[in-house]
Amino acid sequence: MQTQVLFEHPLNEKMRTWLRIEFLIQQLTVNLPIVDHAGALHFFRNVSELLDVFERGEVRTELLKELDRQQRKLQTWIGVPGVDQSRIEALIQQLKAAGSVLISAPRIGQFLREDRLIALVRQRLSIPGGCCSFDLPTLHIWLHLPQAQRDSQVETWIASLNPLTQALTMVLDLIRQSAPFRKQTSLNGFYQDNGGDADLLRLNLSLDSQLYPQISGHKSRFAIRFMPLDTENGQVPERLDFELACC
């Protein structure tokens, strides 16, 4: 059985931001529990990047708009024969609940911004080697606290993002499920099509080909060029089959 590699590419700025936030939140939990300096730096670096992303746009506003848009889309299925009405109504209620929690939550990331340890580490992350024990004695002593005490603090930090995480997960799940994968074929390593107001491209490609896509475009039109991983000896077949979903 062939191994398929999934590539996702945003077709607008809001989706680009959402995917970056999703990625960074996932990275926060990869190396938990924090048991050493390397794990701590991985965690705090991702927290810092997450706060940087929050400061660049109206994340809450865009998510609330999308939660409302998804509710309106689901409401068009109410009363349609053959559609699981209880499932539709449950999703609408979940979207409403996520929106209510998000709109009443404090400023996104504010709890993390105000934490003294996070602020101290953020100041040193841009300096090469700037998180040594003599630069950050606060972090050094924190790493020697009882594991349970560190775990509790990390859980509190991550929990402060729950209103955002819950809303973002629902929105991205619905967008990803909004379009099926369809077989497409590129000619001489190139494929282009209309986006149909899509927010996100999802592309399944066989690992056997050892190719990756370079995608450009926006919601109304996009182009994909397939490139060999081995730039010197790799080849792109004249015809290449892949699966594509415009979500």
Curated annotation (Swiss-Prot):
Q: Provide the protein name.
A: Cell division protein ZapD
Null mutant: what phenotype? Answer: Mutants are viable, with no discernible division phenotypes.
Q: What is its main location?
A: cytoplasm
What does UniProt give as GO cellular component?
cell division site; cytosol
Write out the similarity annotation. Belongs to the ZapD family.
Q: Which UniProt keywords apply?
A: Cell cycle, Cell division, Cytoplasm, Septation
Tell me the NCBIfam families matching this sequence: PRK05287.1-1 (NF003653), PRK05287.1-3 (NF003655)
Superkingdom of origin organism: Bacteria
* Localization (cell): Cytoplasm
Q: State the InterPro entries in the record.
A: ZapD, ZapD_C, ZapD_sf
GO MF terms here are:
identical protein binding; protein homodimerization activity
How the protein assembles, per its UniProt entry?
Answer: Mostly homodimer in solution. Interacts with the C-terminal tail of FtsZ.
Statement: the UniProt record of this protein carries the keyword Cytoplasm: yes
Annotated source species: Escherichia coli (strain K12)
Coiled-coil annotated spans: none
Q: What does this protein do?
A: Cell division factor that enhances FtsZ-ring assembly. Directly interacts with FtsZ and promotes bundling of FtsZ protofilaments, with a reduction in FtsZ GTPase activity.
An annotated GO BP: FtsZ-dependent cytokinesis
Q: Name the Pfam families for this protein.
A: ZapD
Q: Could you tell me the gene encoding this protein?
A: zapD
